[in-house]
Regions:
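Catalytic alpha/beta core domains of metabolic enzymes, predominantly
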Residues: 103, 110-167
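Active-site beta->alpha loop and helix N-cap motifs at the rims of alpha/beta catalytic domains
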Residues: 2-16, 20-24, 28-111, 137, ...
Length: 167
């Protein structure tokens, strides 16, 4: 299993430094990080990032919380560059799964990064949802799981086996 390191943030200078140094294999950000980083124009920030970072994946998250809004945003974000992955949370704020949305997007060739995965059941659900023909990322929040006092290593080991069916 190859381990890939992704930088999570919204500081353009820091992202470019990490990219130029070859320290990471991809980048990801989210609305909270962008707000904390002082980003006021999401599209402009994303397009600036994508002008400079073209050879590794960059994940941008949807802001909407409802399925229709997420889908519209995801379809737009996916047009920004070939190396873009659209981050979709595993659950919305009502606790509803986004697996059906992920399945549609992935089937349509949109690269997704399913984020905030915490359970083996979610891993199963989203391994089933993504297309084997479209690259995808499943982001299991091992650090947050560990913060609750639960050892995330068994989940990670089992998840590696499960995702192997869709490399």
């Amino acid at each position: 299993m190859a381990i890939k390191v992704f930088a999570d943030g919204a500081n353009l200078e820091g992202m470019l430094d990490m990219h130029d140094n070859g320290n990471v294999q991809g980048f990801t950000t989210n609305p909270s990080l962008m707000k904390a980083g002082g980003v006021t124009d999401y599209r402009a920030f994303a397009k600036t990032v994508l002008e400079h970072i073209t050879d590794v994946s960059v994940s941008f998250e949807v802001f909407a919380d409802d399925e229709a809004g997420m889908e519209a945003e995801a379809r737009e974000i996916a047009t920004w560059a070939d190396n873009v992955y659209v981050k979709i949370p595993a659950l919305n704020t009502k606790g509803e799964s986004t697996a059906a949305l992920v399945k549609r997007l992935s089937a349509d060739g949109i690269k997704v990064n399913v984020t905030t995965i915490f359970t083996p059941e979610q891993v199963d659900e989203f391994v089933d949802a993504v297309s084997a023909d479209t690259p995808s990322i499943l982001s299991i929040f091992a650090g947050r799981i560990a913060d609750t006092g639960v050892d995330p290593l068994p989940l990670m080991a089992e998840s590696v086996k499960k995702v192997a069916v869709k490399p």
